[in-house]
Amino acid sequence: MTNMRKSHPLAKIINESLIDLPAPSNISAWWNFGSLLGICLILQILTGLFLAMHYTADTTTAFSSVTHICRDVNYGWIIRYMHANGASMFFICLFIHVGRGMYYGSYTFSETWNIGILLLFAAMATAFMGYVLPWGQMSFWGATVITNLLSAIPYIGTNLVEWVWGGFSVDKATLTRFFAFHFILPFIISALAAVHLLFLHETGSNNPSGMVSDSDKIPFHPYYTIKDILGLLLLILVLMLLVLFSPDLLGDPDNYTPANPLSTPPHIKPEWYFLFAYAILRSIPNKLGGVLALVLSILILAVIPLLHTSKQRSMMFRPLSQCLFWLLTADLLTLTWIGGQPVEHPFMTMGQLASILYFSILLILMPISGTIENRLLKW
């Protein structure tokens, strides 16, 4: 008689995804972040659900309802801070996951990669709308500034902004719809993640060498379940250190002031994980140009598979491309730092240079280095 996990229709899906899944024998800890993202998503949905039970999506009571969660609800403070810092952990895992895909050439699985880009956009939209919900100063002004970017779209821009706002300014209608979207999007992300995995399991996982590893596969359980549990423990450790010791480290103090449309904060900036894109947006003086650069800074990921010129898939044995990859990493960290600085002399120039470097590495230097490395192979 066959094992139930192999014959039962539902158990069979779980079995083929988590237990008997053939996995390459040499995948490193960088392959841990996919499962960590799944766990982060589950954590965010659960904590978000409990927050939604006490939150009120109304401009007059939103701020005080968040205060009520922290002060009066049993363990409300820990749920709130786990949700806020869980988002930061989510994006740390996301950026590492995308970086690993770029480094080891996982983008050659085009369907998996493109759905991954959709997932990234969905996660960014969810996080942005979640940041608006506490209705603090930075929530209100962040929402005003970012939604206003739509007005840069020629002809339909102004109508589009008012349509998104549900009025002539960010107000009750905006908050209510943002809450509705913030609630539904994580479930859409879950569905997209399932499709992401479906396409991944069609081809099988990539590995550090970038070569086909069909002849050397091992079952996912127990080898990688144990390996993933180590990553999970480290993730929980870092998250709980943040939550219990410095829950506001990655937040903005302005968000502890209730939203006031009559007073603008000195520096309007989004959460830290959007600062790199925000710096690219600010580095272009033209509004429409800035918005295009902002969208392209993420959408550029879709072009990476088309610009792959190397005969080798992975960067493991490509020193030139490795140098460019780590230069890109340093550039993104620089952009993140600049995004949090005021729009003043040295930062503006640095932001423009860092933005040019970002696009140059991905669009020009990476393909050139791949071609040079192909030539070097013939020597």
Curated annotation (Swiss-Prot):
It is a multi-pass membrane protein. The keyword Metal-binding applies. Its main location: mitochondrion. Heme b b562 binds at H83, H182. GO terms for biological process: mitochondrial electron transport, ubiquinol to cytochrome c. One of its GO terms (molecular function) is ubiquinol-cytochrome-c reductase activity. Its cofactor is heme b. It comes from the Eukaryota. It is found in: Mitochondrion inner membrane. A ubiquinone binds at H201. GO terms for cellular component: mitochondrial inner membrane; respiratory chain complex III. Binds 2 heme b groups non-covalently. The chain crosses the membrane at residues 33-53, 77-98, 113-133, 178-198, 226-246, 288-308, 320-340, 347-367. Heme b b566 binds at H97, H196. Keywords: Electron transport, Heme, Iron, Membrane, Metal-binding, Mitochondrion, Mitochondrion inner membrane, Respiratory chain, Transmembrane, Transmembrane helix, Transport, Ubiquinone. Component of the ubiquinol-cytochrome c reductase complex (complex III or cytochrome b-c1 complex) that is part of the mitochondrial respiratory chain. The b-c1 complex mediates electron transfer from ubiquinol to cytochrome c. Contributes to the generation of a proton gradient across the mitochondrial membrane that is then used for ATP synthesis. The cytochrome bc1 complex contains 11 subunits: 3 respiratory subunits (MT-CYB, CYC1 and UQCRFS1), 2 core proteins (UQCRC1 and UQCRC2) and 6 low-molecular weight proteins (UQCRH/QCR6, UQCRB/QCR7, UQCRQ/QCR8, UQCR10/QCR9, UQCR11/QCR10 and a cleavage product of UQCRFS1). This cytochrome bc1 complex then forms a dimer. Belongs to the cytochrome b family. Heme 1 (or BL or b562) is low-potential and absorbs at about 562 nm, and heme 2 (or BH or b566) is high-potential and absorbs at about 566 nm. This is Cytochrome b. The gene is MT-CYB.
